[in-house]
Structures are given as C-alpha cells and as structure tokens.
Amino acid sequence: MTNNDEHAKKIFLLRDHGRDATGEVVDWGLNSRLDNLQAAILLHKLKTYKSDIKRRRSIAKMYSKGLSDISAIQLPPSPEFDGINFDIYQNFELRAKSRDELRNFLNEKGIGTIIQWAGTPVHKFKKLGFRDIKLPFTEAYFKECLMLPMNMGINDDEIDYVISSIRDFYG
C-alpha cells in the first residue's frame, strides 16, 4: 500500500506488537487480526478505495457549492484550500448557527445528521480524568458542529435534497 520503505518498516512494526523480524519488541505496536469476513471486505475495499474517495470528494463539492453563500454556515476547507490538505471526507462536518434548530428541521424532513461526541468536547469528559479546563474556541465549535449525510450509498438527488432543505431553513 506504500512505496515508502520507512513507512513500510513502521507499519510492519505496528502490526505485530512493535516486534521486528527477529521477534524483538523495538517500538509500540498493536495486534489486530482480521477474521475471514473482515479480510474479504478489506480485499473489496482495496479495489474500490480510489473511486470511493473520488465519490466522497464529489459529494463534498456538491455540499460546498450548494451551501457556500449561506453566511450562517462555515464549511470545512477543501483539499485545494492549502495544497496539502488530503481530506477524503469520511465526514462532512460544518459549523452552523442555530445548529440544534437546523438539526431538528432536517430530522423532520427525514435527513439524519450527527453531532460529534454528542456535542461535548473531549476535554469535558470527566470520566476520562480530564481537569475542568476552559477551551473557549473548542467549546464554541462544539455548539455549532454538525455532520451532514456522507456515505457511499447517497445519490446526487438526495444530496440536492439536503442542500435545498438547509437553504429553506436559512431562508
């Protein structure tokens, strides 16, 4: 999957508890074996991942083009933004004023959305042992973040429906 010898060496270590070819542990690593079903799915995905990325980027472009003139929305940067961003758009997460109202509106129209981490910044998860710290930019972001539908099964008409519904909400 790589033509970089250093990356290949590191991946080799990571895949088996950080052990090198002699079995000596030389770095941190994992051991995550695939069962036959997972391996079969991965074999298929390795054949389609380039077209999957292309489709995800196409969906993201549709969202960006259809929503870019709405001042109440801040879109994620595109891969062309800085020349080094390689976003494959696993998610299409934007910032939206009146996020909760927008989410309810979309839900009433049959459009599912996700609020990352249930709208709670990770540093606020007390059960993880974090102190009570203030991160105002992070906290502001989490009050507005919203993920739009982004999957390989969604078609262009459905994307257009999401876009037109958001446009209707913001009038």
Residue ranges and their predicted role:
Residues 3-171:
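PLP-dependent aminotransferase class I/II
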